[in-house]
């Protein structure tokens, strides 16, 4: 049970890292999105926490792939939300569809991992 909670924490940190890296790039390089220091702070703290987890815990088989998928999901979700808020950037159809596909893929992989652990 404790390992499952640690795995979920790693996946959540990867999602937040994806959100914050896209937010940082949007805040720094997009003239449409207003500047904010909070995505930068969030990115630094998230990367630090992920690095500490990497140093202090072993990652089970399959978790790095799920963490990468959660990171990509965070990037896509931020892009979808920003494009919905600022339609001048472009359509959010493609990131929204990819986000839904990623959510279902992550859910299927997590369900398979849970069944493998139960056996």
UniProtKB/Swiss-Prot annotation:
This is Inner membrane protein YijD. It comes from Escherichia coli (strain K12). It is a multi-pass membrane protein. InterPro entries: DUF1422. Residues 29-31, 85-88 are periplasmic. One of its GO terms (cellular component) is plasma membrane. It comes from the Bacteria. It is found in: Cell inner membrane. The gene is yijD.
